[in-house]
Structures are given as structure tokens and as C-alpha cells.
Amino acid sequence: MQNKVIRLGEIEISNDKPFVLFGGMNVLESRDMAMQVCEAYVKVTEKLGVPYVFKASFDKANRSSIHSYRGPGMEQGLKIFQELKDTFGVKLITDVHEIYQCQPVAEVVDIIQLPAFLARQTDLVAAMAKTGAIINVKKPQFLSPGQMGNIVEKIEECGNDNVILCDRGTNFGYDNLVVDMLGFSVMKKVSKGCPVIFDVTHALQCRDPFGAASGGRRGQVTELARAGMAVGLAGLFLEAHPNPSQAKCDGPSALPLSALEGFVHQMKAIDDLVKHFPELDTAN
């Protein structure tokens, strides 16, 4: 199977190229924090030679509670994104939830993300595809890896073949997620070689069945990320925070920003090792 290569400036996103770190914070909490977090990622990735794309949400539209923080909104969020791009020269990824958001977001951001809960909404998928931007599709927790081919087909039928697939875990009973490591190769196959990345942060979610916000298992982020990187992936999707216990969204799953360099160093070492191995044909 031929692996597709998506080019984002000087960055090449592909399953057999050096991994790309899609890293940042869960939601934009403030302009100053976004600058702090982005600067930390840029310093680490430049030092280690890892291609980098900054990620954050301007609106967490699917929070469990109506009282939970959602973000600054699209208008203010895009201003912050533009400042990050101007200051650090980074590429950007963020999610959209409504059709009207697609075009204005695509004018600032390099990759627009289709949220897991909305991944089968055909009108939204079509609107995103028609912007011509690179599309990152989050695999719904309730969908098998093999079904992702149908979503890719929708995007391609709209004239856009710049598609990335992202696994963020699969429902395992109530209020728990697991990651099927065999699912990554299934997604590569059904998408005919699209880049596949791993959202290790959201895969660590573990809900309180009666709570208003997600819990998480950030103490296990390194183990889970190591396992995913050993498969051979196009990228890793990661959220970090200066003080996870005070984060306004998904703090229990966020990597402490102080641990970022050591974490990325390990992921790069695994990626370098795996991608130097020759591919073995064990199916025949």
C-alpha cells in the first residue's frame, strides 16, 4: 500500500515519514497562556528536530455541562491564532462545529478538524472539504476503524483528498475508552494510505458517570503514547498545560508542560527506531 503524503509548507505528513507533533492546549483559555504554551512547544520541537503544528480549540461546543467553560469564541480565537502564527511562524489546527465556521477558520488555520461526535454529519463534512483545507477526522468513539473509509470517501467526493485520520479511543462499556492498536493499520488500509495520527490525550479520558466533566489518567500518558508510536504513525496529537489541575477543560488528561521535552524526546526515539525497520509482509 502506498502511503499518501500531505505537504504543509515544509512539513510532510505521512505514515512512513518522521512523526509530526500536533500539540498545544485543549481550549484557548487566554491570549497570554496560548503564547506561553506555543512558545514552549516551539522551543522543544526545534531543539529535537520534530515537525510541529499548534493545536487548540476556540469553542468546546460539546462540553457535558452547560456551565462548563467553552472558550473565547471564533472571532477572538482566530485573532489569537493569527498572532501565534505571526509570532512563532507555526502551522495551526483547530476544530469546527458549525457549517458557517468552516470558511473563516480555513482562512487563518492550516488544518481544520472534524470532531468525533460530528464525523458522520454529511453537510458539515462537505462544507469543510470544500474549503480546500487539510481535514483531520477524529474517529468517533462509537465507530469501528473500518468505517472511517466512508468518511474519507465523502471528503474526496467533494474534491478534497487532503485527509488525516485520528484515533482518540473507542468506547469500552460505559464511561471508559480503550485504544485498539490494530485499528491504526485498518484505518490506513480503508483510507488507501491516508496519514493516521493518535490523540493520546483524549484516549486517556475516564468519565465519572454522574459528573459534569471528564476525568483522566495522565499518569499513564507515556505508556499509552509509547504503544501508539511503536505502530508507526504519521503523528501524535497531544495537549499540555502549565498547571493541569487548574485547566478549564480536560486537565486530568493533560501532560504537565514541564514534562514536554522529556516526553517528546522519548516519542522521537521510538518513531526513529520503528521507521528504520524494513516493512515485513506477514499476511501471505
Curated annotation (Swiss-Prot):
Protein's GO biological process: keto-3-deoxy-D-manno-octulosonic acid biosynthetic process
Q: Which GO terms describe its cellular component?
A: cytoplasm
Q: In which pathway does it act?
A: Carbohydrate biosynthesis; 3-deoxy-D-manno-octulosonate biosynthesis; 3-deoxy-D-manno-octulosonate from D-ribulose 5-phosphate: step 2/3; Bacterial outer membrane biogenesis; lipopolysaccharide biosynthesis
Query: InterPro entries under this entry?
Result: Aldolase_TIM, DAHP1/KDSA, KDO8P_synthase
Which GO MF terms are attached to this record? 3-deoxy-8-phosphooctulonate synthase activity
Concerning NCBIfam families, the annotation shows: KDO8P_synth, PRK05198.1, PRK12457.1
> What is the name listed in the Swiss-Prot or TrEMBL entry for this protein?
2-dehydro-3-deoxyphosphooctonate aldolase
List the gene name. kdsA
